[in-house]
Curated annotation (Swiss-Prot):
This is HUWE1-associated protein modifying stress responses 2. The lineage of its organism: Eukaryota, Metazoa, Chordata, Craniata, Vertebrata. The gene is HAPSTR2. Together with HAPSTR1 plays a central regulatory role in the cellular response to molecular stressors, such as DNA damage, nutrient scarcity, and protein misfolding. Regulates these multiple stress response signaling pathways by stabilizing HAPSTR1, but also independently of HAPSTR1. Belongs to the HAPSTR1 family. It comes from Homo sapiens. Residues 146-181, 204-230, 251-273 are annotated as: Disordered.
Length: 273
C-alpha cells in the first residue's frame, strides 16, 4: 500500500516538475549509489561485517594467546630462557589488534556518515515530491530537525473602531436635523419681532404727530408699514409651520440677516423717527 501511494504521489509531482528539476532529481537518484570502493564496505556492513569481525576476532585470539604465554613464562621461568621474546610477541599482537580496531571504527564511521547523508537527501526529495510547489521555512526546519512545526499565530484583530448600530446612527441624524431646524428659526423670530416693533412705532408716531412734517412722516410710515404687512402676509404662522415641517428652510448667516435688516425700509423709517 505504501509503495503504491508513493508511486501515485510521484506521478502527480511529475506534472509540475520542470525539465531542469527532473534532471536534478535523476542525478540525485544516481548519486545514491555508493562508489565502487565503498560498495564493498557497504556490502560488508550490510552482511554483518563478516570480514571485519573475523579479522578482528583473529587478532584478538593472537593477542590473548601472546599475553597468556607471557604470564605463563614469567611464572615458571627456566634457566637459559629469555623473557624478551614472549613479551615482544604479546606487545606486537596487542598493538596490531588496537590499530586494526581503530581503522575498522573509522571506516565504519565514514560509511555511516555518507549513508546517513544520502538517506537524508533521499528523505527530503521524497518529501518535496508530495506535490508542494512552495515550502515554508518553518516546515523545512521542523522536518530537518525532526520536530513538530509550531502552531500558527492567532489572527490579528482590526484596529478600526466597530461601526455603531443602525438605530444609533438614525438617532444622531435626527438630532442633527432638529438642531439645524432650531438654528433656522432664529432669523424668522427676529423678523417677526421687528415686524411687531415697526407696528408699535407706527402707532406711536400717529398719536404724537402735531406738525405737518410729522404727519407726512407718519403717513409715509403707514404706507411702508402696510407695504411690509402686504409682504409678510403670505408668511403667516400656519405657512411658517408648514415650511418648518417640510424642512425646506435654508440656513442664513448672521451677516446676511444683519445686511437684510440694515437695508430694510423698517430700519430706514426708524432712523427717520
Amino acid at each position: 500500500m505504501e509503495e503504491q501511494q508513493k508511486e501515485g504521489e510521484a506521478e502527480v509531482a511529475e506534472h509540475w516538475f520542470s525539465k531542469w528539476e527532473r534532471q536534478c532529481l535523476a542525478e540525485a537518484e544516481q548519486e545514491e549509489q555508493l562508489p565502487p570502493e565503498l560498495q564493498e564496505e557497504a556490502a560488508a556492513e550490510l552482511a554483518g561485517l563478516k570480514s571485519e569481525k573475523q579479522k578482528l576476532w583473529h587478532l584478538f585470539q593472537i593477542s590473548a594467546t601472546a599475553v597468556a604465554q607471557l604470564y605463563k613464562d614469567s611464572g615458571c621461568q627456566q634457566q637459559g630462557l629469555s623473557m624478551w621474546d614472549p613479551f615482544q610477541n604479546a606487545a606486537m599482537a596487542v598493538t596490531s589488534l588496537y590499530k586494526e580496531s581503530g581503522d575498522a571504527h573509522q571506516r565504519s564511521f565514514d560509511l555511516g556518515v555518507q549513508v546517513g547523508h544520502q538517506r537524508r537527501i533521499k528523505d527530503v526529495l521524497e518529501w518535496v515530491k508530495k506535490g508542494r510547489s512552495t515550502i515554508r521555512r518553518e516546515d523545512l526546519i521542523s522536518f530537518l530537525c525532526g520536530k513538530v512545526p509550531p502552531a500558527p499565530p492567532p489572527p490579528r484583530t482590526p484596529r478600526t473602531p466597530p461601526k455603531p448600530p443602525t438605530g444609533v446612527t438614525s438617532q444622531a441624524v435626527a438630532t442633527e436635523s432638529s438642531s439645524s431646524v432650531d438654528v433656522d428659526l432664529q432669523p424668522f423670530q427676529e423678523a417677526i419681532a421687528l415686524h411687531g416693533l415697526s407696528g408699535a412705532m407706527a402707532g406711536i408716531s400717529m398719536r404724537s404727530g402735531d406738525s405737518p412734517q410729522d404727519s407726512g412722516v407718519a403717513s409715509s410710515g403707514r404706507r411702508k408699514t402696510s407695504f411690509l404687512e402686504d409682504d409678510l402676509n403670505p408668511f403667516d404662522s400656519e405657512e411658517l409651520a408648514l415650511h418648518l415641517d417640510s424642512g425646506g428652510i435654508r440656513k442664513r448667516t448672521s451677516a446676511q440677516c444683519s445686511d437684510g435688516i440694515t437695508d430694510s425700509p423698517i430700519q430706514k423709517r426708524n432712523r427717520m423717527v
